[in-house]
């Protein structure tokens, strides 16, 4: 369960442009340690919503993360409830203690997490 919560938090922090800051969570438990949460096999699930909040798609995902020093290779397999299957491979680099950057071949630009 901690891995799933950590993964959700990771994608919220890396995928959304907002005013949230890592310091907003500094006293939260358990502490999010990306190297622990994204190592090995992780199960995830989620929904996509339109601007009015209506759920438009749902998915379950299997992730597998392998660290090599400060670099993570994260393989994702998404199974959408409409039957679509999607795969993605992220290369995530740890920049320093609090900053990460990730790229994937089907994602434009660089994801930044902190």
Regions found by a protein language model. Name each.
Residues 2-7:
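Sec-dependent signal peptide recognition
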Residues 14-15:
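C-terminal motif of bacterial Sec signal peptides marking the signal peptidase cleavage site
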Residues 19-20:
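Family-specific signature for flavin-dependent thymidylate synthase
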Residues 25-41:
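N-terminal helix-cap/turn-to-beta initiation motif at the start of protein domains
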Residues 45, 50-114:
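Central antiparallel beta-sheet cores of small beta-barrel/beta-sandwich binding domains
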């Amino acid at each position: 369960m901690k891995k799933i919560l950590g993964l959700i938090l990771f994608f919220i922090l890396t995928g959304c442009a907002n005013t949230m800051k890592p310091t907003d969570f500094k006293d939260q438990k358990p502490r999010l340690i990306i190297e622990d949460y994204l190592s090995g096999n992780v199960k995830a699930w989620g929904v996509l919503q339109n601007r009015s909040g209506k759920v438009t798609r749902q998915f379950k995902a299997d992730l597998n993360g392998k660290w090599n020093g400060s670099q993570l290779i994260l393989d994702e397999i998404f199974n959408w409830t409409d039957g679509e299957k999607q795969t993605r491979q992220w290369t995530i680099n740890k920049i320093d203690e609090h900053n990460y950057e990730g790229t994937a071949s089907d994602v434009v630009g660089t994801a930044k997490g902190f």
